[in-house]
Amino acid sequence: MKIDILTLFPEMFAPLEHSIVGKAKEKGLLDIHYHNFRDYAEKARHVDDEPYGGGQGMLLRAQPIFDTIEQIEAKKPRIILLDPAGKPFTQAYAEELALEEELIFICGHYEGYDERIKTLVTDEISLGDFVLTGGELAAMTIVDATVRLIPQVLGKESSHQDDSFSSGLLEYPQYTRPYDYRGMTVPDVLMSGHHERIRLWRLEESLRKTYLRRPDLLERYDFSEEERKLLDKIKEALGQGED
């Protein structure tokens, strides 16, 4: 995969080199470049200007963004604008982006964008209903979530398949040594060696956690008959079963 990031602050992305992104680069699975679009600004290196019609703040000018993207060698890239008004980013979105060969991210850092920039864009993405100072943190988050899904980046293919949200449910609780820590012990079922019992326990715990913390995920979840019965059992235990 090839990723190009347009930003006024390339140095902000240094931590990515020490994460899964760095490992992907070492394996030759990722080629990533950072472009300071101030270098392409024609008007005394100014990348922002006042909005026509008046208003608060400054807008990112179209010219530096157009010129930067036009010098990037890419065939059919997905061009992503980080914007609070964009489509919410999800695990499913990350899985979709991981199938692409080329991604370009545009990180803003002002009140907004000249609307004409959006004629270049294929995706407008938001991390949630809040506003960040710039798009860099959002871009780093999306890049990390996407790159780890590229085949062979993680040690085992199942590593990300068991993550929260990959299955549509939150991940079940996990434990490691010691068995007893300050009186808190590992559930006996995990010590049993009985694979089917462990599978059922993990599924039930995933359903329980999702029901209690993110019930909205269950509204669009495609339940198997087994999962539906387990959820009914959970609701009954909580005194919330159907009449």
Curated annotation (Swiss-Prot):
Gene3D superfamilies: 3.40.1280.10, tRNA(m1g37)methyltransferase, domain 2 (1.10.1270.20). SUPFAM superfamilies: alpha/beta knot. InterPro entries: Alpha/beta_knot_MTases, tRNA_m1G_MeTrfase_C_sf, tRNA_m1G_MeTrfase_TrmD, tRNA_m1G_MTases_N, tRNA_MeTrfase_TRMD/TRM10. Its EC number is 2.1.1.228. The keyword Transcription regulation does not apply. CDD domains: TrmD-like. It comes from the Bacteria. It catalyses: guanosine(37) in tRNA + S-adenosyl-L-methionine = N(1)-methylguanosine(37) in tRNA + S-adenosyl-L-homocysteine + H(+). It is found in: Cytoplasm. One of its GO terms (biological process) is tRNA N1-guanine methylation. S-adenosyl-L-methionine binds at G108, L127, G128, D129, F130, V131, L132. Keywords: Cytoplasm, Methyltransferase, S-adenosyl-L-methionine, Transferase, tRNA processing. It is an enzyme of class 2 (transferase). One of its GO terms (cellular component) is cytosol. GO terms for molecular function: tRNA (guanine(37)-N1)-methyltransferase activity. Homodimer. NCBIfam families: PRK00026.1, trmD. Belongs to the RNA methyltransferase TrmD family. Specifically methylates guanosine-37 in various tRNAs. This is tRNA (guanine-N(1)-)-methyltransferase.
